[in-house]
UniProtKB/Swiss-Prot annotation:
EC class (word): hydrolase
Protein name listed in UniProt: Elongation factor 4
Biological process according to GO: positive regulation of translation
Domain tr-type G: 11-193
Residues the record lists as binding GTP: D23, H24, G25, K26, S27, T28, N140, K141, I142, D143
């Protein structure tokens, strides 16, 4: 491996990712590129090849990023080395997108020829521009009956401000236009800058746990060279490890003699503990370390918190291990142990959003075989106390005594909703019902409107996305970012069963909606909790004040069945005896609460009032 060869090779490297809104054909395009460059034989080819998680295939979304090396012989006769880094399109996985873009020089922007630009397309384009990437717009699905490539070309220029005159019309499904895209990558995406002779600097953009080889780092080499036998050092904590193997993905892992500047591949170095490596950290060589780390990623703060508890309490330690392994390549997942009187031992977890929460729950249940109970999600509130102190509260059961609270502030998001004109009314009505404040509205073209609202995050984590989809027949697209904290009239609502508070059912609610939400919940719980041998009152309370109540009637055995005719006082005596027995039972009996009860707090819905 002489330096000249390495420098020549570096000029032939092109690192790029594909960015798109959900369902605009990103994974299909990646499949076609793999086929065209003959990276994957037709025998191994399957739809959504890079979406290796079952969950990704079933939901038709990309959750984790994937990096792959391809060789392409261009029209100029030269062979180029492409690194394709696949990215998720959903708003909850923006962090994954920003990580993969940091490892690239170019991005292919896929826009659906029928649907045009959507909210998340915009969000991801801005991320790409922040990373100074060369953006190549392409217009996909031109074989659809509703396709209108010219309108979309105009939209790309007007809304994003990119020159779309050379945007390639493609159909990833039919394989049209793939070669033009590959040629554009060669011409327009710059080769990686970086110095082979400089000390090693490699950016960790993902990591996976292998039970035999420990933690395997996925890296982009920015400067220098790394090979088996080297001793690497993590720049964040100074820990050192001996490299056992380096290589690339095609999608299968293939060992190599070295990784040099511009390469995207993996390093295995028998790293045993998950905590020693952090995504966004810089790897360097121990004997000739780089003077400073690369600019990593901005740390993502979780927005939504929920309790996760194993249904079988013996699996508490398994759950901890599962969370640690998921955290390894999902740096945005945070968790800490917590206990609940109702649910026992579990963890309080922080997520980027509801889809993220959903995906983590499903991955734990599938990959680690642990059945879970999740509590209702909540957000982080700033609570200003009367003594001048400010505390952050993410768990409703930790809310301080209301008499000591001066004000409560909640997070608001700037929600950008793109929607066809005929649904604007429905969107505005929904946003207002969710305590949203109108900001602005502009027309993208004759038919589509971009509406911006400020909405409390707590309203969005409930069911905003589902409601938005159903009120616009699925045509709306939605993206949000945290904008500010605002003071709100919020109260903590407790649910009492049989006079006892159930901590896992507590939630924070706006004072205005407290009564109706309390009523909805007690009525729902009444339907869900099975009848007991004794009467069970369900109450919703704010502080000491009960705002709603519903009773589950007791199951009664007919004690009069064998008392034919006879004196009324005899019947009364039997009934009194039954009553006394029930009373005794109530004092010692506890109420079984099924899992649906916790979820019912989640799916509280205005429709339930009807």
């Amino acid at each position: 491996m002489n330096l000249e060869d390495l420098k020549k090779r570096q000029e032939k490297i092109r690192n790029f990712s594909i960015i798109a809104h959900i369902d605009h054909g990103k994974s299909t395009l990646a499949d076609r590129i793999l086929e065209k460059t003959e990276t994957v034989s037709s025998r191994e080819m399957q739809a959504q090849l890079l979406d290796s998680m079952d969950l990704e295939r079933e939901r038709g979304i990309t959750i984790k990023l994937n990096a792959i090396e391809l060789n392409y012989t261009a029209k100029d006769g030269e062979t180029y080395i492409f690194h394709l880094i696949d990215t998720p399109g959903h708003v909850d996985f923006t962090y994954e997108v920003s990580r993969s873009l940091a490892a690239c020089e170019g991005a292919i922007l896929v826009v659906d020829a029928a649907q045009g630009i959507e909210a998340q397309t915009l969000a991801n384009v801005y991320l790409a521009l922040d990373n100074d990437l060369e953006i190549l717009p392409i217009i996909n699905k031109i074989d659809l009956p509703a396709a209108d490539p010219e309108r979309v070309r105009q939209e790309i220029e007007d809304v994003i401000g990119l020159d779309a005159s050379e945007a390639v019309p493609t159909s990833a499904k039919a394989g049209i236009g793939i070669e033009e895209i590959l040629e554009q990558i060669v011409e327009k995406v710059p080769a990686p800058t970086g110095d082979v002779e400089a000390p090693l600097q490699a950016l960790i953009f993902d990591s996976v746990y292998d039970p035999y080889r420990g933690v395997i780092l996925q890296v982009r080499i920015v400067n220098g060279v790394v090979k088996p036998g080297d001793t690497i050092q993590m720049m964040s904590n100074g820990k050192t490890f001996d490299v056992t193997e380096v290589g690339i993905f095609t999608p299968k892992a293939i060992g190599r003699d070295y990784l040099a500047t511009g390469d995207v591949g993996y390093i295995a170095a028998s790293i045993k503990t998950v905590a020693d490596t952090r995504v966004g950290d810089t790897v360097t060589l121990a004997e000739n370390p780089a003077s400073e780390p690369l600019a990593g990623y901005k740390q993502m703060n979780p927005m939504v918190f929920a309790g996760i508890y194993p249904i079988d309490s013996n699996k508490y330690n398994d759950l901890r291990e599962a969370l640690e392994k998921l955290q390894l390549n999902d740096a945005s997942l945070q968790f800490e142990p917590e206990t609940s009187q109702a649910l026992g031992f579990g963890f309080r977890c922080g997520f980027l959003g509801l889809l993220h929460m959903d995906v983590i729950q499903e991955r734990i249940e599938r990959e680690f075989n642990i059945d879970l109970i999740m509590t209702a999600p909540s957000v982080v509130y700033h609570v200003n106390m009367t003594d001048g102190e400010m505390i952050d509260v993410a768990n409703p059961s930790e809310f301080p005594d209301p008499t000591k609270i001066a004000t409560i502030e909640e997070p608001y998001v700037k929600a950008q909703i793109m929607v066809p004109q005929e649904y604007v009314g429905a969107v505005m009505e929904l946003a207002q019902r969710k305590r949203g404040d109108f900001v602005t509205m502009d027309y993208i073209d004759d038919n589509r409107v971009n509406v911006i609202y400020q909405i409390p995050l707590a309203e969005i984590v409930f069911d905003f996305f589902d409601k938005l989809k159903s009120s616009t027949r699925g045509y709306a697209s939605f993206d949000y970012e945290i904008s500010e904290y605002r003071s709100s009239k919020l109260v903590k609502m407790d649910i009492l069963l049989n006079g006892d508070k159930v901590d896992a059912l507590s939630f924070i609610v706006h004072k205005e909606f407290a009564y109706e939400r309390g009523k909805i919940i007690v009525d729902k719980l009444k339907k869900i909790i099975p009848r007991q041998q004794f009467e069970v009152p369900i109450q919703a309370a704010i502080g000491q004040k009960i705002v709603a109540r519903s009773d589950i009637k007791a199951l009664r055995k007919n004690v009069l069945a064998k008392c034919y005719g006879g004196d009324v006082s005899r019947k009364r005596k039997l009934l009194e005896k039954q009553k006394a027995g029930k009373k005794r039972m109530k004092a010692i009996g506890s109420v079984e609460v099924p899992q649906e009860a916790f979820l019912s707090v989640l799916s509280m819905d205005e429709d339930d009032k009807k």
